[in-house]
From Swiss-Prot:
InterPro entries hit by this protein: Ribosomal_uS2, Ribosomal_uS2_arc, Ribosomal_uS2_CS, Ribosomal_uS2_euk/arc, Ribosomal_uS2_flav_dom_sf
Organism: Methanococcus aeolicus (strain ATCC BAA-1280 / DSM 17508 / OCM 812 / Nankai-3)
Similarity annotation: Belongs to the universal ribosomal protein uS2 family.
HAMAP family: Ribosomal_uS2_A
Entry-linked PANTHER family: 40S RIBOSOMAL PROTEIN SA
Name used for this protein in its record: Small ribosomal subunit protein uS2
Gene Ontology terms describing biological process: translation
Assigned GO CC terms: small ribosomal subunit
Domain of life: Archaea
Keyword set, alphabetical order: Ribonucleoprotein, Ribosomal protein
Presence of the UniProt keyword Ribonucleoprotein in the record: yes
MF GO annotations: structural constituent of ribosome
Length: 220
């Protein structure tokens, strides 16, 4: 059960390391930072992260699953990202983002999403660049060192840890489906299932593995 109106328990957030940033910060991310530790690591404000996850899910829930493209090139995000796509029906692209995916209609992998959800604005810079070019909104997981000029909706989080990334994907999947009336309080999937996918990654990711989105029934 969540506490103090959080999406999950504070203990779950802290155990995932979702609040652990880097030893660098930008002015863009300063408003989400709670403190700096003695070892120089910046710590994110968990309650602000929780709030932004909820708001991001609410924003994404305005779109059909096939209108959203979720991408990640970071290897430990691939498993949770695929689980995210399987759970929600949202289109996902894991691994290297092939140039022209959003801008070249002649490409076999050409997609026309209405919104982009990325796991790291630096690692996923090709997808970010193309989303900017075609003018669609961008939701992004951002750590303390990121520049966020082109991110329309920031989710402040540790986007490098397996546990933290798995938790973000799980919570957004859950809240997205709740907001669209597809599930109720009895959630048919767990954070542990997302985390298991992250922990099982041992091999190099193949270039751009797609999962096409699917349309669910009408929202309630």
């Amino acid at each position: 059960m969540a506490d103090d109106n959080l999406l999950t328990t504070l203990d779950t957030y802290l155990a995932s390391g979702i609040h652990i940033g880097t030893q660098q910060k930008t002015e863009d991310m300063k408003r989400f930072i709670y403190r700096v530790r003695a070892d120089g690591l910046y710590v994110l404000d968990v309650r602000k992260t929780d709030e932004r996850i909820g708001l991001a899910a609410k924003f994404l829930s305005k779109y059909e699953p096939e209108e959203i493209l979720a991408v990640s090139r970071r290897i430990y995000s691939v498993g949770p990202l695929k689980k995210f796509g399987q759970t929600t029906g949202i289109t996902t692209a894991a691994g290297r983002f092939v140039p022209g995916t959003l801008t070249n209609p002649s490409s076999r992998k050409f997609l026309e999403p209405e919104v982009l959800f990325l796991s790291d604005p630096r690692i996923d810079r090709q997808a970010l660049k193309e989303a900017i070019e075609i003018g669609i909104p961008i939701v992004g997981m951002c750590d303390t060192e990121h520049l966020t000029s082109f991110i329309d909706f920031i989710i402040p989080t540790n986007n490098k840890g397996r546990k933290s990334v798995s938790l973000v994907y799980y919570l957004i999947a859950r809240e997205y489906m709740k907001n669209r009336g597809l599930i109720g309080e009895d959630v048919p999937f767990t954070y542990e299932e997302f985390l298991e996918k992250a922990m099982s990654v041992k091999v190099k990711v193949k270039p751009q593995q797609f999962q096409r989105g699917r349309r669910w029934g009408k929202r309630r």
